[in-house]
């Protein structure tokens, strides 16, 4: 098991961030709890990756963002991954996710950071404001995975978090230290 990865769960107020975490981790979902405002909470989860390894995730359930309120900058400095949440029945929440992705790219400078996007509340399809195809095209252009989920069906939540844990547990692709027995191109040699 790894050291534990810090994952920030963020999105507009009332998109279902806390409900997603409560359902995923504890199987709890109470209809009508959507209006409870979260200040900030941290959940611990041990998630099995696609390679069968358990990864410890520290899931930071952030306060719901509102008009004119940005995600506090300290989240960008320590996060290993992000779960961006919008509600399919709220176009503004999707637009905020687009802005959050741009902010992450700016602060993380496209470094190793895992991002998954969740379009929540697909059970409210008759109130849909975010077209599924438009959202998927955006996700593809941003090179992130997007799932449409509902907290009323816990199974829809498992795959995104399994993929996230798998991405976070992958060994770093390049080391900044030379491997023993290999010559570095940049090293000057005095053996001439």
UniProtKB/Swiss-Prot annotation:
Keyword field: Cytoplasm, GTP-binding, Nucleotide-binding
Region (Interactions with NFKBIA and NFKBIB): 58-93
Main localisation: cytoplasm
Example GO biological process: Ral protein signal transduction
Region (Disordered), start-end ranges: 168-192
Record-listed GTP binding positions: 11-18, 61-65, 120-123
Keyword GTP-binding: yes
UniProt GO MF annotations: GTP binding; GTPase activating protein binding; GTPase activity
Gene Ontology cellular-component annotations: cytoplasm
Recorded superkingdom: Eukaryota
Compartment(s): Cytoplasm
Pfam families xref list: Ras
Keyword Cytoplasm in record: yes
Span(s) of short sequence motif Effector region: 35-43
Record remark: domains: In contrast to other members of the Ras family, the members of the KappaB-Ras subfamily do not contain the conserved Gly and Gln residues in positions 13 and 65, which are replaced by Leu residues, and are therefore similar to the constitutively active forms of oncogenic forms of Ras. This suggests that members of this family are clearly different from other small GTPases proteins.
Assembly, per entry: Interacts with both NF-kappa-B inhibitor alpha (NFKBIA) and beta (NFKBIB) in vitro. However, it probably only interacts with NFKBIB in vivo. Forms a complex with NFKBIB and NF-kappa-B heterodimer (p50/NFKB1 and p65/RELA). Also interacts with c-Rel (REL).
Entry function: Atypical Ras-like protein that acts as a potent regulator of NF-kappa-B activity by preventing the degradation of NF-kappa-B inhibitor beta (NFKBIB) by most signals, explaining why NFKBIB is more resistant to degradation. May act by blocking phosphorylation of NFKBIB and mediating cytoplasmic retention of p65/RELA NF-kappa-B subunit. It is unclear whether it acts as a GTPase. Both GTP- and GDP-bound forms block phosphorylation of NFKBIB.
Family listed: Belongs to the small GTPase superfamily. Ras family. KappaB-Ras subfamily.
UniProt-recorded name of the protein: NF-kappa-B inhibitor-interacting Ras-like protein 1
